[in-house]
């Protein structure tokens, strides 16, 4: 039984014994209420009984919870003739019992929800609890394997590029050597063609001189022949008749003169030939020296150019390798940043979801704490009302021997089991 006590019996403060209780008591599910037969047949209160016959303790107003704080009179069941309470009061008591049972049931359900939420909070707050994340390890392994293959392929491509560049350098060397040899051959052929021209000119000069010598020899023979003919003709004309001796200069020996002329021309020809050979040898030696010096300079320039080309190609290959390595490292850094940003975003989403869940749990806990406080306050008021009603019943029971009337005794004996049953039920619920 429970109701809000009167201002004299129960204040608005919570019950003193409720401060030591942290959780609400459970009401057993086997609690039963009084049957309707007890309320109708055994606790009948006569409606014709006036208020003047009631004692002063029964006329004090008690404020019931189910009656919207409307005061009602609790009669003395030992003094009444047919029962302790009237029908309205019994209905109010039954309503209070139902309400107390519903409050206790609600307290039990809230405690279960509180325990479940505490378990969830404990599971969320455990240090070894790892967040559930999707397993991307096999994808990471595949990506790492593909990255290794890509790096190996890039290294192989770099090695092949170096080999191709080396082959190009060797081909350039052979091409430069071929070009140098070709230029030397062209120079030699040009020199040979020039010398052949000079040789042709000298041959022409020689043939001209030989033709001139032959013509001179023919002239000499003609002169000799003419002279002999003239001599013979004169001898035939003169015969032996005249022996003329002329005191003239001795005659010139034409053969000797011709021999001298021949020797002179031969000496001139030999001198010219020797001078031409010396000039040709000097020119050839000078050209050979110039060719050798030019070839040495050309070879040095070509060697220096090849060295510079080789150095430039080596530096270009190193630059390409460094650029490839830089690009691969930049790609690796970008992939790593993307991977860690994805993981960070996943972790942040997980943290946000957990924080949202914790905020919801805190809100639920605060709401349940408020409801729990309200229920504790209600329980304290109900216990205060129960104690008030128990005190009133005990007072009425203590007055029972002093009240006269056999009808009251019969009514007391008829209603006592009902009130005792209700008190026991409430005590079992609040134990």
Curated annotation (Swiss-Prot):
Keywords: Coiled coil, Intermediate filament, Keratin. It comes from the Eukaryota. Residues 125-135 are annotated as: Linker 1. InterPro entries: IF_conserved, IF_rod_dom, Keratin_I. Residues 1-89 are annotated as: Head. Coiled coil: none annotated. GO terms for molecular function: structural molecule activity. The keyword rRNA-binding does not apply. Residues 89-400 form the IF rod domain. Residues 253-396 are annotated as: Coil 2. Residues 397-431 are annotated as: Tail. The record marks 338 as: Stutter. Residues 90-124 are annotated as: Coil 1A. Residues 237-252 are annotated as: Linker 12. GO terms for cellular component: cytoskeleton; intermediate filament. Pfam families: Filament (PF00038). One of its GO terms (biological process) is intermediate filament organization. Residues 136-236 are annotated as: Coil 1B. There are two types of cytoskeletal and microfibrillar keratin, I (acidic) and II (neutral to basic) (40-55 and 56-70 kDa, respectively). Heterotetramer of two type I and two type II keratins. Belongs to the intermediate filament family. May play a role in late hair differentiation. This is Keratin, type I cytoskeletal 40. It comes from Rattus norvegicus. The lineage of its organism: Eukaryota, Metazoa, Chordata, Craniata, Vertebrata. The gene is Krt40.
